Structures are given as structure tokens and as C-alpha cells.
């Protein structure tokens, strides 16, 4: 665990694109169609960007995860630690959580997998598809046509198929993905998973849940806040 490279620089995604509910202008979302991917690219980008942020906007600290759906260590974190972190810190209002994509060049299917999650995010279902990407990686990374699988899984979680498939096959969320990638590179990130806690403390790679909690708690204690 080290000091984070360039505090604040990891959030260039938002400043570059002007997107996001917490960091940019809000988007009007129809209550009648919560799981429909909109046709307008700007709206897709705005909704996808804000969907990958979870937790109370007034939370005292922020946790950023830089990740790759095809990375085995990222999957290990998801399976072993992510739900505990979410329960103790995010759902309790202690931390706001932001997921940033940083696919490795040796992972050819990682890019479309990120698109699958961001297109789902445009329909308000980012985290549901995020979980599926990690839990079914062995299926999609070897599929002849992973997009067809992604559409099938999107329907499983209540997303309308036509708009979702259009989003995928036309690379609609690509600007958000490129901004994520460039932002991580400029911040000196070279591998995944990589975490930044409280804009100050970096966690590189997979660590035990005990060490992860200790890192978060150290930031809270340094700010005079209670730990869970």
C-alpha cells in the first residue's frame, strides 16, 4: 500500500467528458423505462458514467477501483472481498465507490466486456452486469460471438434487448472507455486491480480482506472518523 499517484488525477474521466451525476450535470431518466438503453450517445455516456458510481454522495471518503473483467486477480477480488467492502463501507454510507475500466492489451475480450457493463449502466443495471462479467468470464472470453451472450444476459436482468444490442454493436460507450484508459495511464497505473482509498492511499493488486479493511480504516482514523 502506497500513496496514490497524483491525487485526484484518476477522476479525469469525468472532467474530460463532463459526465456523471456526482461530478457533472444530472440526466433526466424516465421512471417508466428504467431498463431501456437510450438511443442518444450523449445520454448513454452520462447514464453509464454515473451508474458505475455507488454509495452516498455525502460519504466522507471515496474508493476507486481500476479493473479489467478478464484479469484473474480482479475476479479474485470480486469473489473474495468486494461484497464485504460494499456491505461495510458503501451501503453503510462511509464510502462512495467508483469503478474505472483499464483493460490489459493482452486481454482481447476485455474491451467488449466493459462495453457490456457500460451499456447495461445506461439502462441503470451496471452493477448487475458487472457481477455477471466476473462470474461468467469463462463463458464469454471463449465465445465465438460474445455480444450475443451479453444480450442474452442483459435480458436476464431486465434490459430491453434491441437498444442494448445496438449499444454494443455500435461501440456507443467507447468514449467513456477511452477516457478511463487514458486517465489511468496518465496516473501511472500499470496493472490491475488497483485501488485508491480516500484520494490518498493506493492498494496494488489483490490483498486479503483484512489488509484491505485495515487500509480503509487507516484513512478513516486519520480523518477522525469511526470505523465499522
Residue ranges and their predicted role:
Residues 1-15:
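Bacterial N-terminal signal peptides that target proteins for export
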Residues 11-25:
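Bacterial N-terminal signal peptides
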Residues 27-43:
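N-proximal helix/coil linker or "cap" segments that precede and/or mark the start of modular domains
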Residues 41, 125, 136, 171-173:
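Residue-level recognition of alpha-helix termini/interfacial anchor residues
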Residues 44-61, 89:
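A short beta-strand-turn-helix
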Amino acid at each position: 500500500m502506497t500513496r496514490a499517484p497524483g491525487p485526484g488525477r484518476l477522476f479525469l474521466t469525468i472532467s474530460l467528458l463532463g459526465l456523471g451525476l456526482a461530478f457533472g450535470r444530472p440526466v433526466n431518466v424516465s421512471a417508466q423505462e428504467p431498463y431501456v438503453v437510450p438511443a442518444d450517445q450523449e445520454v448513454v455516456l452520462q447514464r453509464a458514467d454515473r451508474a458505475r458510481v455507488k454509495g452516498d454522495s455525502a460519504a466522507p471518503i471515496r474508493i476507486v477501483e481500476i479493473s479489467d473483467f478478464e484479469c484473474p486477480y480482479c475476479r479474485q477480488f470480486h469473489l473474495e472481498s468486494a461484497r464485504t467492502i460494499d456491505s461495510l463501507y458503501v451501503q453503510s454510507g462511509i464510502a462512495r465507490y467508483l469503478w474505472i475500466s483499464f483493460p490489459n492489451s493482452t486481454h482481447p475480450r476485455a474491451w467488449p466486456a466493459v462495453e457490456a457493463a457500460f451499456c447495461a449502466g445506461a439502462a441503470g443495471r451496471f452493477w448487475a452486469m458487472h457481477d455477471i462479467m466476473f462470474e461468467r468470464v469463462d463463458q464469454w472470453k471463449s465465445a465465438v460471438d460474445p455480444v450475443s451472450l451479453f444480450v442474452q444476459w442483459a435480458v436476464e436482468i431486465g434490459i430491453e434487448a434491441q437498444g442494448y444490442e445496438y449499444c454494443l454493436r455500435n461501440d456507443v460507450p467507447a468514449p467513456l472507455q477511452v477516457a478511463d484508459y487514458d486517465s489511468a495511464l496518465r496516473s501511472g497505473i500499470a496493472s490491475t486491480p488497483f485501488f485508491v482509498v480516500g484520494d490518498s492511499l493506493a492498494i496494488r493488486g489483490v490483498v486479503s480482506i483484512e489488509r484491505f479493511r485495515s487500509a480503509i480504516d487507516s484513512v478513516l482514523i486519520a480523518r477522525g472518523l469511526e470505523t465499522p
